[in-house]
Regions:
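Bacterial Sec-dependent N-terminal signal peptides
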Residues: 1-23
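Accessory carbohydrate-recognition regions in carbohydrate-active enzymes
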Residues: 21-475
Length: 475
C-alpha cells in the first residue's frame, strides 16, 4: 500500500512539474528592443559610426519569418543603413509595416506608416512625432504598446504575418486623427481614401540598391487600412500643403492622407492593416483571411501561441534568468529572415523582374530577403535543425529564383539579384540542407543551378552588372 501511494505521489509530482513547465511563458524572456541601441565595444566605435555600430534590429511584432515586421517608427526614411527605430530617439512618428533587412545595413522597402494624433492636426512625420518613455513601452514579439505623451493616446499593436490590428485609446477624444504615409523616398507613391468601404489604400514602389541602384524592382508594396468609426473630416497632403476633402494623391515625396474620427467619449478605436507585394486584391485577401474580425485580444492570443510554440522548440536548462533572456532574445532575432513573400493565395511577383505573378505550390511559402553573406554560417543551419520543412521551402525558393532569373542568386534581397559580397553562399546553404537530410526541394534543379554558377559566367556585362553569376569568376 505504501509503495502504491508513493508511486502515485511521484506521478502526481511529475505531472504537476510538467504542467508548471508548460505554463511558463517564454515570451517573458524576450525584450524586442535589444539591439536597437549602439554597441559599447571599442570595435563598434571604430567601424560604422551611426550605422553599423547599432545592432540594426527592430522591436517588431511579427510571425516567425512573416511578411511584415510591425514596428514603431522613430526614423522617417527607407534609406540605406537607417532602421525604422532606434532606442536613443525620443519621439515616435508612427507604426510601420517594415521590410527592413534586420541586422544588416541595407534598406527598408515597400512600407507604409500610420499614426494616431489628437488636438491640432500635425501630419508630417517630423512634426507629429510624440514624446514617449521606454518605461511606458511593452515590447514583445506578439504585442507592442506605448503611451504617446503629446496626445495622451495609448497605442497597442499586434498582428499576423501579412496583417495587423491596432487599438488606439484617445484619452482626449476631441479631434482624433489618423495619419497614413506611403514611405516612398523616390516620390512614386500613391494613396487614396474610400469613405464608402471605410478604407485607406495605397502603394509604395520598391527600388533596388547595390546592383541596379535606384532602379525599379518591378513591383510595389500595396497596403489596405480599414477603420470602423464614422469620420467627420478627411483629406490628403504633400509636404506643407494640406488638401481638405481630397481623396487621393500620388507621385511626390512627403505625401499622405488623414482622417478625423467622429468620437465624443473616451475609448479605443480599432484599425486593421494588411499588405501585399502583388496587388491591392492580394492585400485585401490577406487581411480577410488572417484577421477577419475586430477582436484585438483574439489576434494577440493567436500570435502569443505562435511565439510560445516557436520559442519552446529549444529548452534552456538553467535558473539563470540572464542566460534565458540572451538565448530566447537571440532566437527571436533569428526568426525574422528570410521573410514570407507570397500572399495567402500563393501569388508573388516573379524574381528579378516582378512580372508575371507566380503561384507557389499548395501549402508552400515563397521566401525572400536572404542576407546570405551574413546568415549561411549559422542561421540557415539552425533553421535546418529546428524547422526542416520550412528550411526545405526556403531552399526551394532559391531554386525558384534560379528558374525564374536564369542564375542561382548570391545575395537575393527585395526579390532582386544583388552581389554586394563576393562568394556564392546560397550554394553553402543548399549543401547544408541536403547534408542534414532535407529533401523537400528540387534537388536536381538545385544542383543544376549550383553547377551553372560554378562553371559559367553571364554572356554579357549587363547581366553581370545586374548581379547575375558568381563574382570574380574567370570566364
Amino acid at each position: 500500500m505504501k509503495s502504491t501511494l508513493s508511486y502515485l505521489l511521484i506521478i502526481c509530482s511529475l505531472f504537476t512539474a510538467c504542467i508548471g513547465h508548460q505554463e511558463e511563458s517564454l515570451l517573458f524572456y524576450v525584450d524586442t528592443r535589444t539591439g536597437t541601441a549602439p554597441s559599447a565595444t571599442h570595435t563598434a566605435e571604430l567601424f560604422g559610426k551611426n550605422t553599423e555600430e547599432y545592432g540594426q534590429t527592430l522591436p517588431a511584432v511579427l510571425e516567425p519569418n512573416g511578411m511584415n515586421f510591425w514596428t514603431p517608427q522613430t526614423q522617417d526614411t527607407e534609406a540605406k543603413c537607417k532602421a525604422p527605430y532606434y532606442y536613443k530617439d525620443t519621439k515616435i512618428q508612427g507604426f510601420r509595416n517594415s521590410h527592413w533587412i534586420v541586422g544588416g545595413c541595407t534598406q527598408d522597402y515597400g512600407s507604409m506608416t500610420l499614426m494616431p494624433v489628437s488636438g491640432t492636426l500635425k501630419y508630417l512625420p517630423q512634426d507629429r512625432g510624440s514624446l514617449f518613455s521606454h518605461q511606458e513601452e511593452t515590447a514583445t514579439p506578439a504585442y507592442y504598446s506605448v503611451l504617446l505623451k503629446d496626445y495622451s493616446i495609448f497605442a497597442e499593436m499586434t498582428g499576423r504575418s501579412r496583417s495587423a490590428i491596432f487599438r488606439f485609446t484617445y484619452n482626449q477624444p476631441e479631434d482624433a486623427y489618423l495619419i497614413v504615409n506611403p514611405n516612398s523616398d523616390e516620390g512614386k507613391g500613391y494613396i487614396e481614401i474610400d469613405t464608402i468601404k471605410k478604407q485607406i489604400r495605397g502603394y509604395n514602389p520598391v527600388h533596388r540598391i547595390y546592383q541596379g541602384w535606384g532602379e525599379p524592382a518591378g513591383y510595389n508594396g500595396y497596403f489596405i487600412i480599414e477603420y470602423q468609426n464614422e469620420i467627420e473630416e478627411y483629406g490628403t497632403f504633400r509636404h506643407d500643403s494640406l488638401f481638405a476633402g481630397q481623396r487621393q494623391i500620388a507621385d511626390g515625396t512627403g505625401i499622405g492622407a488623414y482622417l478625423r474620427f467622429k468620437i465624443h467619449s473616451e475609448g479605443p478605436i480599432l484599425i486593421k492593416a494588411a499588405s501585399s507585394f502583388t496587388d491591392m486584391e492580394g492585400a485585401q485577401k490577406n487581411l480577410d483571411t488572417e484577421i477577419p474580425h475586430w477582436d484585438f485580444d483574439r489576434t494577440r492570443q493567436e500570435l502569443n501561441s505562435i511565439w510560445e510554440q516557436r520559442l519552446s522548440q529549444v529548452t534552456v536548462q538553467t535558473n539563470n534568468r540572464n542566460d534565458k533572456e540572451k538565448f530566447y532574445g537571440a532566437l527571436y532575432r533569428a526568426s525574422f529572415l528570410p521573410r514570407t513573400f507570397n500572399d495567402v493565395d500563393g501569388r508573388y511577383p516573379s524574381f528579378s523582374t516582378g512580372h508575371p505573378f507566380r503561384q507557389s505550390a499548395n501549402g508552400r511559402n515563397y521566401y525572400e530577403d536572404y542576407s546570405m553573406w551574413d546568415t549561411y554560417r549559422a542561421l540557415h543551419p539552425l533553421v535546418n535543425i529546428l524547422t526542416p520543412k520550412k528550411a526545405g521551402d526556403m531552399m526551394q525558393s532559391l531554386v525558384d529564383k534560379y528558374e525564374q532569373g536564369g542564375w542561382l542568386p548570391i545575395f537575393p534581397c527585395w526579390n532582386s539579384y544583388t552581389a554586394a559580397m563576393i562568394g556564392d553562399h546560397c550554394i553553402s546553404a543548399l549543401g547544408d540542407a541536403y547534408i542534414k537530410g532535407i529533401r523537400n526541394f528540387d534537388i536536381n534543379k538545385a544542383c543544376e543551378g549550383m553547377l551553372r554558377n560554378a562553371f559559367r559566367t553571364p554572356a554579357t556585362y549587363e547581366e553581370y552588372k545586374n548581379g547575375m553569376g558568381r563574382r570574380a569568376l574567370n570566364s
